[in-house]
């Protein structure tokens, strides 16, 4: 997810 660590 773009908002957390690129996960």
UniProtKB/Swiss-Prot annotation:
Cell location: Secreted
Keyword annotations: Amidation, Neuropeptide, Secreted
UniProt keyword annotation of Secreted present: yes
Leucine amide PTM positions: 7
Chief location category: secreted
GO CC entries: extracellular region
Protein origin, superkingdom: Eukaryota
Family assignment from sequence similarity: Belongs to the allatostatin family.
Protein role: May act as a neurotransmitter or neuromodulator.
Protein name as annotated: Carcinustatin-5
Organism: Carcinus maenas
């Amino acid at each position: 997810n773009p908002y957390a660590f690129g996960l």
